[in-house]
Regions:
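Short hydrophobic beta-strand that contains or immediately precedes a catalytic carboxylate
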Residues: 93-96
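A short, conserved beta-to-alpha structural element at the edge of catalytic cores
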Residues: 117-139, 337-357, 420
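A long, amphipathic alpha-helix that forms part
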Residues: 268-309
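A beta-strand-loop signature enriched in Asp, Gly, Thr, and Trp
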Residues: 304-355
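His/Asp/Glu-rich, glycine-adjacent segments
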Residues: 17-75, 108-124, 128-259, 264-274
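A short acidic-Thr-Gly-centered motif at the start of a beta-strand
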Residues: 75-88, 249-253, 298-306
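Active-site neighborhoods of enzymes that stabilize oxyanions during catalysis
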Residues: 340-446
Length: 446
């Protein structure tokens, strides 16, 4: 992938391959043409489709399938998926971090071949992520049923003004110090208290529905995990084989009523950051994961009598290929940083600027001069009001966490402000199709 502007090229519909709905060709035009009124986000921007074709709406659908009272947001506008899910005894949702729709389709006939039996009997639909297109925001939406504006987890690094700290929202430690993970909790802050809305596990427990979450051992007790998985039975795993073996053991055990199981796997995302999302290593990791899913979960369950499972495979965002460029290091731009109260927050590809009074015009002019046409500048209050971060009433912390202005990256652009080497070959957070459009694959195993 080149460093120029990324263009979305729809992959031809695989009508011969899919025996039941492949909704890609009908839904993609809706996603690429959708616009949030009053917001100009750039020519390559995919606007989040919060009205019925986004991860926010998937959260509402899952709650409805499990019999929970309706939440504040619309479910997915996918009647075929509702029919597939109707009456399912168990719902298993697996999120494979950083898998864009385009890469999924490219890999389906190669490393994704183990999925073939699943797609022959299932449903494929493209959805948009939320804004920003990042794990902390998307997972929190899926586990609360609320938009990023409502739940307030608006990026990877956020200014938590109430604690006087820029925090890493995965580790809940200072963003500037990797060796202080969990500092907020050690200081007495309960991770769940950072969410102003209830989580799915708590709502399921109140309804008497069994809930499980399978998280890699290295992040099972992270701040973000502790924020999300209250009232949920938490399981660790060491590899994809371990994950799918454990999930099959759970699914083969008859539930007392309905059951919800969630799995999160970060291997594709981690390797994409280091080696680039188009590297052979990432393709191999994807193949390793889906082969384990097919061999240790899908095929054995299809041979098991009396099991009724709805399996969803989805992603939170994709990635774009980037190359480290010294000109993007803010330490080399004192004429910009002196106009900021503190370093940017949010994402390297969707940055929140905390401006000194009266410096907005000069900061914007500097950015336009140094990186022409690479960023779109948005007033943070305007973006929040217009619904870029989702519908609903924003939580009281949202405005301060977004700062004064937002920089939306185009093409492969980004900013780098961390006090460590810039080595990443894959990034996300912005609004390109590669970051925003993700696959949802569903199959009923019975």
């Amino acid at each position: 992938m080149t460093g120029g502007p990324l263009r979305w090229t729809p992959v031809p519909s695989r009508r011969i391959v899919f025996a039941v709905p492949d909704l890609t060709s009908t839904i993609l035009p809706q996603l690429t043409s959708h616009r949030i009124p009053g917001l100009e986000l750039g020519a390559d921007a995919i606007h989040p489709h919060y009205a019925g074709l986004s991860l926010l709406n998937l959260a509402a659908s899952i709650e409805r399938w499990l019999g929970l009272p309706p939440g504040p947001h619309a479910p997915l506008q996918l009647p075929a998926l509702d029919s597939l899910a109707q009456g399912a005894e168990q719902i298993v949702v697996c999120l494979l971090d950083a898998l864009s729709l385009s890469r999924y389709l490219q890999w389906l006939d190669g490393p994704g071949r183990p999925l073939q039996g699943m797609v022959d009997a299932g449903l494929l639909a493209p959805l948009t992520s939320v804004v920003p297109s990042t794990t902390t925001s998307a997972l929190t939406t899926l586990w609360t049923g609320r938009s990023p504006a409502e739940h307030g987890i608006l990026g990877y690094e956020l200014l938590l003004r109430e604690y006087g700290l820029v925090a890493n929202m995965i580790t809940l430690g200072p963003a500037a110090f990797d060796n202080q993970r969990g500092l907020l909790e050690r200081a007495g802050v309960r991770p769940q208290s950072l969410l102003p809305v209830p989580t799915l596990g708590t709502r399921l427990a109140q309804a008497g529905i069994e809930a499980h979450a399978y998280i890699g051992n290295s992040i099972r007790t992270s701040g973000l995990s502790r924020m999300h998985y209250a009232d949920t039975t938490l399981h660790g795993f060491g590899s994809p084989a371990d994950l799918w073996h454990s999930l099959r053991q759970l699914a083969e055990r008859p539930p007392d009523g309905r059951r919800f199981a969630w799995a999160y796997y970060s291997g594709v995302d981690a390797l994409s950051h280091v080696y680039g999302p188009d590297s052979d290593l990432v393709r191999a990791e994807f193949e390793f994961f889906v082969r384990a899913m097919n061999d240790l979960f899908v095929q054995p369950l299809e041979r098991s009598a009396g099991r009724d499972v709805l399996l969803l495979l989805l992603s939170d965002h994709g990635q774009v290929a980037t190359s480290p460029q010294p000109h993007r290091q803010l330490s080399l731009h004192p004429d910009l940083t002196r106009r900021l109260h503190l370093s940017p927050t949010g994402e390297a590809r969707l940055s929140y600027l905390h401006l000194r009074p009266g410096e907005a015009e000069a900061a914007r002019a500097y950015i336009d001069h140094e990186w022409p046409a690479e960023f779109t500048w948005l007033d943070s209050d305007e973006a929040l009001r217009a619904g870029l971060f989702g519908p609903g009433t924003p939580c009281r912390q949202a405005a301060s966490r977004l700062g004064d202005a937002i920089l939306i990256s185009h093409g492969a652009a980004y900013l780098w402000w961390a006090d460590k080497p810039d080595t990443l070959l894959g990034r996300h957070g912005s609004l390109t199709a590669e970051e925003m459009i993700v696959p949802l694959l569903a199959v009923r195993l019975e």
